[in-house]
Amino acid sequence: SGEWLAVVSDRGGRPTVQLRRMSDGSVVPVPQLSRHQPHSSPSLSWNGRYLAAITQRGRRRLAVVTDRLNGRMHPLPLPGGRDPVQLSLAPDAQQIALQVTDQGRWRVELLDLSDLLEPDRPPGQSLSTPALSSEP
């Protein structure tokens, strides 16, 4: 929606994701990512509820999606020891495209996140809730 910008900046010698509010330039912390550095390839959902990024845990690179509403961080399992290189989160957070390396080859994989995350809908978009029946 243009309200948020996710950037990678050098903080203490490590690439770190920062979330900036565009209206005033303030930086909003993302505590879920603080233990898993360095960071790369940040991507935001429509309203900025979900922040996807690639993090490092030991020698392993992980693709994660952080839900800023409830504070949960969801690591995305990649089969066969593939390493994420870049990612792009769909605006509604229902899919993510991942560029991965697999035994020296580059691949792009599309993961369905609809069982993991609820949609991040644009402002004003109504939910498709069925009408209540007047009969018991």
Where in the sequence are the language-model features?
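Structural motif
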Residues: 14-18, 59-64, 104-111
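Post-signal-peptide N-terminal segment of Sec-exported extracytoplasmic proteins
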Residues: 1-31, 36-37
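Blade-terminus and WD-like Trp-Asp/Gly-His loop motifs, strongest in beta-propeller folds
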Residues: 1-4, 41-50, 87-95, 132-135
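Extracytoplasmic electrostatic interaction patches
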Residues: 74-85, 90, 94-95, 103, ...
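Beta-strand C-termini and the immediately following turn/loop, strongest in propeller blades
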Residues: 7-12, 52-58, 97-103
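Multi-bladed beta-propeller domains
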Residues: 22-38, 55, 67-83, 113-136
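Glycine-centered loop/turn positions within well-structured domains
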Residues: 3, 15, 25, 49, ...
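Conserved positions at the start
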Residues: 14, 38-41, 83-86
